[in-house]
Every structure is written in C-alpha cells, then in structure tokens.
UniProtKB/Swiss-Prot annotation:
Top-level lineage group: Bacteria
Name of protein: NADH-quinone oxidoreductase subunit N 2
UniProt record similarity statement: Belongs to the complex I subunit 2 family.
Lineage, uppermost ranks: Bacteria, Pseudomonadati, Thermodesulfobacteriota, Desulfovibrionia, Desulfovibrionales
HAMAP family reported for this sequence: NDH1_NuoN_1
Known role: NDH-1 shuttles electrons from NADH, via FMN and iron-sulfur (Fe-S) centers, to quinones in the respiratory chain. The immediate electron acceptor for the enzyme in this species is believed to be ubiquinone. Couples the redox reaction to proton translocation (for every two electrons transferred, four hydrogen ions are translocated across the cytoplasmic membrane), and thus conserves the redox energy in a proton gradient.
Compartments in which it is found: Cell inner membrane
Residues spanning the membrane: 1-21, 31-51, 66-86, 99-119, 153-173, 195-215, 231-253, 258-280, 287-307, 315-335, 357-377, 394-414, 434-454
One Pfam family it belongs to: Proton_antipo_M
Keyword annotations of the record: Cell inner membrane, Cell membrane, Membrane, NAD, Quinone, Translocase, Transmembrane, Transmembrane helix, Transport, Ubiquinone
Length: 467
C-alpha cells in the first residue's frame, strides 16, 4: 500500500489549495476555463484507485470496495457540477472561492466514505457541511439565499446535537466507536436498549443530509434560495456521503429489528410526504426539493432490507439518482434568466426554443419516475426486489403507489416543455455545453439499458460488508 492509494483525496485536496491560492491572488482571474478539466482528472484518479485496499489512522480510515466506489461517484458528481457552473453564462462570473468551497465540501465527503470509526465519521461529516454553510447564502442581494443559509445552519446545528447525544449513548453501551466492533454485538432493543436509542439518534445526522422525513424541512427552502449551481450540488453530492455511511451502519443491523423497522417506516412516510408536497409546486427547484425527500424514502428500501442485495441496490440507486438529478438541474440552470428560479411555466415551448434541452429534461423526468429504459427504473427494480425478498411487502406496495403519484408532477414538466406555447426567444448555448448535457442524458439511458457492470461493482462492495 502506497500514498497513491489516497490519490482521489490528495488530488481534491490539491485542487482546494490551488483554488485557495487563486482566491487570495491579486489577479482575480476566472477559473472556469481550467477547473472542469481539473475536476475530470479527479475522476480518472478515482478510477485509478478503485481497486486499492488498506487502512490508515489506526484502522479508523479504511479503503475498501464501498469507499472507492463512492469516491468515484463523488468525483464524478463534482466534475459534473463544476462543468455546469463553469459552462453557464452566470457561472463564468463565479469567483475562485466559490469553487474552493465546493471542492472542500466534496473532499470532506470523500473522507467520509472511508471513515469506519464514529468520531472520525462525525468530523468528516462536519467538514463537508461547514463549507456549505458559507456557500448557500452566496447569491448576491437575494434575501431568500440568506434565509436558506440560516435555515440550513439552524437545522444542521440541531441535528448535530442529536447525533452527538446518540454517539455518547453508543459509546456508553458498547465501549467502542469502531464499526467492526459494533458489528460484532447485538443490536436488538431487548439486549441493548441504550445502544439502539443512540444509533437512532446518531443516524439523524445522516437523515438530515439525505433530506429524509422528518429531517427534510430545510430541503425545499434551501434549493429555492441557493444559486442554481449550488442547488445542483446540494441536491446530489452530499446525498452520496449520507448513503455510504448509512450503508455501513445498516449492514450490521439484521432485518426486522427495531432500527430497520424505523428505517422502513421513515422511508414510507418520506416517500408519501415528498410526493404529495411536490404535486402543488410551481417553482422547479422547490419541486425537485420535495422530489429529493421522496427519493430518500426509496433509498430506505435497500437499507431496511439489510441484505447484501439491499446494500448493493442502495449504492446503485445513489448513482442513478445523481445522474438523473444532475440532468434535471442542468436544464434548470440552462433556462434560468439572470440566475432567477425558473417555474414550470418557463418550460413552455421548450421543444421549439431548445429541442436538446427538452430532450434532456424528458430523459431526466422519465428516470425520476422510474420508467424503462432509464437508470431510475433499474435502480427502483433492484430496491423493490431486495425489500420484497426480505418480507417488506407492505413497503414495496407503498413505494409502487408513490411512484404512481410521482408520475403527475414529473410528467407535468415534460407536458409543459412539449405542449405548452411561449413567445420567449430561442435559448442559444455553445455546442460543447449542449453536448455535455446530452452526455448526461445518454448515461441515464445507458445505465438503464446496461446496469449489470456498475451493479456488479456495487455488489462486490456490499459483499465485503456481508461476507
């Protein structure tokens, strides 16, 4: 094992340092010209380190299949967000410190993916969060951004207190903070009531990141108030950090125990609350915010199943989720006027004004619903199968009903784009930027048509947690 095992983290840390130097330099030059390429090299670094294994920091930091898989997803998502931001008209005016905060958050999430000890988990979680506390309010003089930032900080502080309180319960009951030690003990409420209560409270910190009900109240307001590019990041990449930790924690809790029952119930309520609230939204980012709440509920199907198939499905669905959500936010950023929040009415006549954007939006919407042959369909199929095999039949039925509900508001976006009429002028974008969005749509379709390679990769990672 060499220092090259940590290549993804080191590359992103180097990028943070380069952006920091650029932000304090007397010459305030735009970094939009070189940053997407540098972020793309980070994806190659994550691919290079995909097979690396090892332990650091007294076995508190572990390189395994799961961590390397999620580091690849984080690097890919960061590269896409920087590409969207740098290619956007308003994004060219973004300063180096804006991108530095994005990179610092992504670096914290990469560290989070490898942490297998509760205290280091908590520190990595906070590292990834602090930069977002500063990033979300950055939207000129828009008061909604300040409101969004305050809500994110206040909710984050409250949930952090809960997580720390739960951590103290776990330490008191189990006398260890290493996940390997925790996995070797019983997690039945009858055997360890204090530990189960502590774990439930500790999970709250990651439910907050995932925007799972009832820790979701910040989500639509933050999406609506933050810059469009910032919302694209907050809606996708931090979710990966939450999922990888939840997969690790759920792996040592057997199905149908109290904790997994709580996960199943929260998943069902989150799906229902998110979809019902999204039905009445007109603001696109707010709609996608409540959509995130619903998708957090879908992820719970795999975690509640508690099997290797369930963990694999949750990891695969995370990839599908960031692809289809980034494609949707790509369109949001492209149609926004003067960095304003677009509404459903702004989609009217999009098939005439920008046919490529209308097609990308349609692919993203179909995948968010879960229609074949998209990544969303394959991901939901794996989740439903894993939950059904473990006897969560009622949860599968709730998920299917919620998928039917979501058809209305997702396809309403497509309806506005293809049947609405508008006198607005055509939307003109550089060909390279449109090709970038088209590549996202192609990946969404490709992952739905050929899910096996990446699902097998996720299954190998989950198999290490369930030998």
């Amino acid at each position: 094992m060499s220092i090259f095992s940590l290549l993804p983290e080191l590359w992103l840390l180097g990028l943070v340092c380069a952006l920091f130097v650029a932000s304090i330099s007397d010459k305030k030059q735009s970094v939009a010209s070189w940053l997407p390429m540098a972020a793309g090299l980070g994806v190659l670094a994550a691919l290079f380190a995909l097979g690396e294994r090892g332990e650091f920091l007294y076995a508190a930091y572990k390189l395994d299949g799961l961590s390397q898989f999620f580091k690849l997803l984080i690097a890919f998502g960061f590269a896409v967000v920087t590409g969207i931001a740098a290619g956007n008209k308003e994004g060219k005016d973004l300063t180096p410190d804006y991108f530095m905060l994005l990179a610092l958050s992504a670096w914290g999430l990469m560290l989070l993916a490898s942490c297998v000890e509760l205290i280091t988990l908590y520190l990595a979680l906070e590292l990834s969060s602090y930069s977002l506390y500063a990033l979300i309010p950055l939207r000129g003089q828009d008061r909604r951004a300040a409101e969004a930032g305050i809500k994110y900080i206040l909710f984050g502080a409250a949930v952090t207190a809960l997580a720390l309180f739960g951590l103290s319960y776990i330490i008191a009951a189990k006398h260890t903070t290493y996940l390997s030690g925790l996995a070797a003990t019983s997690w039945s409420f009858a055997d360890a009531p204090m530990a189960v209560i502590g774990l439930t409270l500790f999970l709250a910190g990651f439910f907050y990141k995932l925007a799972l009900f009832p820790f979701h109240f910040w989500c639509p307001d933050v999406y609506q108030g933050a810059k469009n590019e910032t919302a694209a990041y907050v809606a996708t990449i931090p979710k990966l950090g939450a999922v990888v930790v939840l997969v690790r924690l759920a792996a040592f809790v057997a199905p149908h125990l109290e904790v997994t029952t709580i996960l199943a119930i929260l998943g069902a309520v989150s799906m229902t609350a998110g979809n019902l609230a999204a039905l009445v939204q007109r603001d696109l980012k707010r709609l996608l915010g409540f959509s995130s709440v619903a998708h957090a509920g879908y992820v719970m199907l795999g975690l509640a199943a508690g099997s290797a198939a369930g963990m694999s499905a949750a990891a695969f669905y995370s990839l599908a989720y960031i692809l289809m959500n980034l494609a949707a936010f790509y369109v949001v950023c492209a149609i926004a006027k003067n960095d304003e929040n677009p509404s459903l009415d702004d989609l009217d006549g999009l098939y005439k004004r920008a046919p490529a954007l209308a097609m990308i939006l349609a692919v993203a919407a179909f995948s968010l619903v879960g229609l074949p042959p998209t990544a969303g369909f394959a991901g939901k199929l794996f989740l439903l199968s894993a939950a059904w095999d473990q006897g969560y039949h009622w949860l599968v039925i709730v998920a299917v009903l919620n998928t039917a509900i979501s058809i209305y508001y997702y396809l309403s976006m497509v309806r506005h784009a293809y049947t609405g009429e508008s006198d607005a002028p055509a939307i003109v974008w550089p060909r390279g930027y449109l090709i970038f969005g088209g590549a996202l749509a192609v990946l969404v379709l490709l992952l739905g048509i050929l899910p096996a390679p990446l699902y097998d990769l996720a299954a190998q990672a989950a198999g290490q947690l369930h030998p």
